[in-house]
Amino acid sequence: MSYDYEKTSLTLYRAVFKANYDGDVGRYLHPDKELAEAAEVAPLLHPTFDSPNTPGVPARAPDIVAGRDGLYAPDTGGTSVFDRAGVLRRADGDFVIPDGTDIPPDLKVKQDSYNKRLQATHYTIMPAKPMYREVLMGQLDNFVRNAIRRQWEKARGL
């Protein structure tokens, strides 16, 4: 049995703000093979599902909202990435999704628009079909693993 996954056609970058995560995510900025095979990965590609209620932090809308049936549908939002590193200057770094990375079959990467101010094109990683939150998070975690694996392969000329 063969699986031919759609692959990313260009390198994409996800801004990482270390304060948004419970653990140390710094190692994801320069991952290794061991991290690609880890049982658990940091939720680097998870969108904001709920508006944060943190005192002193301006409220912002969720990146994706579930329908009445509890499912997250295609073209209703998702995870923001850009085609250029360092777009968000306040970020601690960027998680790299190299060109040629396998896109999990239940996700899609949609090109949105060019942002003149940021001088970068915005893309959204979103569900390719309706799915529950836990399934979406699992698919996004698999995308992280695939990106780490592809980084490792590219570093070795594979």
UniProtKB/Swiss-Prot annotation:
The superkingdom listed in its UniProt entry is Bacteria
The UniProt keyword set, sorted, is: Secreted
**InterPro entries cross-referenced by the UniProt entry:** ADPRTs_Tse2
Tagged with keyword Secreted: yes
Q: Effect of altering residue 122 to A?
A: Complete loss of toxicity
Q: Where in the cell is it found?
A: Secreted
Known partners and oligomeric status = Forms a heterotetramer with Tsi2 consisting of two Tse2 dimers and two Tsi2 dimers. Formation of the complex inactivates Tse2 enzymatic activity.
* Name this protein carries in UniProt: Toxin Tse2
Organism, as annotated: Pseudomonas aeruginosa (strain ATCC 15692 / DSM 22644 / CIP 104116 / JCM 14847 / LMG 12228 / 1C / PRS 101 / PAO1)
Gene it is expressed from: tse2
